[in-house]
Amino acid sequence: MGTPKPRKQPMNIISFNTNSIRMRLHQLKSIIDRLDPDVIGIQESKVCDEDFPFDDIAELGYHAEVHGQKTHYGVALLSKTKPEQVFKGLPDEAGDAQRRLIGAAYQDPKLGKVTVINGYFPQGENRNHPTKFPNKVAFYERLNLLLETRFTPSENILVIGDMNIASVDEDIGIGADNQKRWLREGKTSFLPEERAWQQKLYDWGLTDTYRHLHPSGNDRFSWFDYRSKGFEREPRRGLRIDLILASQPMLKKLTKADIDYEARAMVKPSDHCPIWATFKG
């Protein structure tokens, strides 16, 4: 395992939908070199656990906890230090459920125990889809159950990941006509019922870190479609659907949060940008 940089006071958290981690190791190295994260939540690792690139991650100075499957889905938590506890999956999931959630508790010298829950939330496709939309409903319901039964809002909790919902209209950058068409056709990402599911997370006690620091920002997005070259267009066309949500104790320590466009501009990038937040003890 590589030697991590000396521990500094702030805790840096990154969430990154890699769209295949083995294809994005160059992006991972870039964000590690530039942002020096303590914990990285990976979504869409798209690799079964036995084929995960543990050696490559160790060379970057990180320990990996994984919950993956072949070809689709998959999540992981990469960290400078091993977590105290790890859990995988959601309450009442079937044994063959899609591998979409992993959580771990870390001991930070300044902040104390910090629990990071990392998820690749279902996209849902369309409210009329017979399986994908109900799967998205169930995922949000089970996540709420997890929070309500295992945690309290007074703890240091971070829920991070590709949440596949644009919470407010400022998170939508696909053009007014497309926005209206998506709503008219029932296409997922910002349907009223989806926003209601996300609101339950906020009601429990979580806050969107980026929106907290940038309340009126409407020109920064985390996902850009490959086919329409949304990242290359001017203005850029995308959605902000990757989030780092913090409980109130963590929110009080939040100092910075942003979206990393530099990684998205690299060759052979994921369609998602890494996002990050910094917490000072």
Residue spans of the language-model regions?
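Metal-dependent phosphoesterases centered on the DNase I-like endonuclease/exonuclease/phosphatase
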Residues: L60, F139-R237, I241
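Surface-exposed cleft-lining segments at the edges of enzyme active sites
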Residues: P91-D92, F121-Y140, K180-G186
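N-terminal, active-site-proximal structural segment of metallo-dependent hydrolase catalytic domains
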Residues: G2-Y62, H72-V75, L191
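Active-site-proximal beta-strand elements of phosphoester/diester hydrolases
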Residues: P10-S20, K113-N126, H272
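Active-site beta-strand/loop signature of hydrolases that rely on acidic residues for catalysis
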Residues: F16-N17, I32-E50, V116, L146-D171, ...
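Structured beta-strand-rich core segments of catalytic domains in phosphoester-bond hydrolases
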Residues: S45-C48, F52-N128
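Active-site beta-strand termini and strand-to-loop segments that position acidic
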Residues: K80, A104-K110, S247-Q248, S270, ...
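Conserved beta strand-loop-helix elements of the APE1-like EEP
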Residues: T71-V86, F231-K253, F279
